[in-house]
Structures are given as structure tokens and as C-alpha cells.
């Protein structure tokens, strides 16, 4: 039992940052309200986001523990789908571990101007 607990703790503590290239992000739908994209990450994972409401730029990155990669996906498989609500942001950027950024999606210039001309105090979503 002690060995199992030790393995479980190790697999949960060892977290790997997933680079943009390894995430395999593909946009699968872009309509008037939202953009939907899929990742090709094996197993489950978690993500961290930060939205600058003034600029409309959302930053995101994915990370994964060994438990999420090899074990938890058996019990709780993810669909690996993410949505961008266009009313909440005008650009979504992936940030790699070294700080390199890659644009996942960016609104057309006229939508950016409209977003930036409004005050964004309402709740997200």
C-alpha cells in the first residue's frame, strides 16, 4: 500500500508543461459567437488562462502530470475541446515554457476595434 501511495504521489507531482507544437491545436469551428478548437494531447490535462480585459487578449498554456497522461484518462476521458467566446476576447495566445507566444485565434480588425471601443465590466461567459 505504501508503494502504491508513493507512486500515486510521484505521478501527481511530476507536472510537465505542454508546448504549443505538442498540443496539436486545430480550429474546428468559427461562427459569429465562438471559436472552437481541439487539442491532440494524449490523456487528460489542465490549463491556465489569463485574460487582459483592456486588450482583449487571453493567454493560455497546458500542463499535465504523469497521472493525467497515463491513468486518469482511463477513468475520466476528456473531449479535448475548448471554446473562445468572441464577446469576451479578441485574441487567444498560447504561451510556451520559454515565453514564446503563438496566436491560436485573432478577431478581424473591425471586431477588434469594436471590442476596444467598449468598456468590459460585465461578467465573462
Model-derived segments and their meaning:
Residues 10-27:
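Ser/Thr/Pro/Gly-rich low-complexity linker/stalk segments immediately outside membranes or between
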Residues 20, 28-125:
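Polar, acidic low-complexity tracts enriched in Ser/Thr/Gln/Glu with frequent Gly/Pro and Thr-Pro motifs
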Residues 1-10:
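Hydrophobic membrane-insertion alpha-helices, especially the h-region
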Residues 9-11, 34-35:
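Short secondary-structure boundary micro-motifs
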Amino acid at each position: 500500500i505504501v508503494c502504491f501511495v508513493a507512486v500515486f504521489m510521484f505521478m501527481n507531482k511530476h507536472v510537465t508543461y505542454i508546448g504549443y507544437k505538442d498540443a496539436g491545436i486545430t480550429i474546428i469551428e468559427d461562427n459569429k459567437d465562438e471559436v472552437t478548437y481541439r487539442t491532440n494531447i494524449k490523456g487528460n490535462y489542465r490549463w491556465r488562462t489569463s485574460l487582459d480585459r483592456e486588450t482583449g487578449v487571453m493567454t493560455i498554456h497546458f500542463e499535465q502530470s504523469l497521472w493525467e497522461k497515463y491513468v486518469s484518462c482511463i477513468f475520466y476521458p476528456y473531449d479535448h475541446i475548448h471554446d473562445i467566446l468572441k464577446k469576451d476576447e479578441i485574441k487567444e495566445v498560447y504561451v510556451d515554457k520559454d515565453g514564446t507566444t503563438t496566436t491560436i485565434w485573432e478577431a478581424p480588425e473591425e471586431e477588434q476595434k469594436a471590442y476596444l471601443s467598449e468598456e468590459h465590466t460585465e461578467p465573462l461567459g
